[in-house]
Every structure is written in C-alpha cells, then in structure tokens.
C-alpha cells in the first residue's frame, strides 16, 4: 500500500471528485424511511394500481358484536412501500374520550396480479389473519374484498373462525368494514370506519 501511494499528491480535481461522490451518497441516504427502512422511490409495477392506498389516514369508527357492548374509536392507518411487490400496513386505535390505546395491528398487503391480492395481519391479541381477495382500481379509487383463508391463534387468544374485510377508497377518503365469526357466534358485522388522507 505504501509503495502504491508513494508520490501521490492530493489536488483540486481529486477534491471536486470526492465532493461529487459524497453528494451522491447523501442523496441516496436522504430517502424517506418506513419504520427505519429506506424507501425506494419507485412503486413496484404490480402494486401501481393500488397506489391510491399509500399514505397516512386518520378518522373514526365504531364497533359492535353480539358478545360485547358497542364502542367507538379514533384511528390511524398507514400504507407504505419499499419498492417490492407488497405494501406495509399498520393500524392503531384510541379511545376518543380519554386517548387510551385500544386495538393495533400490523401486516403486509401482497399484490399478486391485476386482480388478486393477499394480506397477512398480526394482532397483539394473539391472532393472525391470512386473507385472500380481489380488487378493482383506477387512478384515484379502489375496492378490495378479502376473505380469510386461515385464522391462527395463540393458546390464550380468543377463538376467531373467519374474517372478511372490505376496503373502499375514493377522493382521499377510505371506508372499511370488518365482519367475523368469533367466540362461537355466526358471521356478523363488527367494525366500520371512515378515514381521510392526511399525508402521502
């Protein structure tokens, strides 16, 4: 190494080149992040029809079921991407009166082709939903229908047999409905909410 470097002198041209390289690295690492992961600038081609989902959504919803009292909640949903053929999904809700945390879940929306989607959602209640479905979309709207193909539960989780989810989006407004068969009850409506996009 010393022999290779002998006689080398730093000059203005080298300095300019070094600054150009540094600028390129800074530009690369200034990309936005999702949960600490740098986000690719381009959405994966197969995900582009569902690009209207991307962003931060906030609003309110309500829930009911035959085994519990009716309730209300405020909610934040985030769909984001890292340039691969899926969207990352996170959701959290709070009590609208005292702000205490309620439900939360995280998962991935996997786009299979121009009609089919899959989704996996994990919940801190010990439940994991595996869903499959279909979608229709245009430049600013989409509808997605999911049905569970499997619901996995930890040993202490409440029993859930089946789940359906419907997501509708148009004009920066997202509406969804969730139905389920749980705790020995037949399939029935459980949740609905209306959210507005607050950031892309």
What residues fall within each predicted segment?
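Short hydrophobic alpha-helical segments enriched in small aliphatic residues
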Residues: 12-18
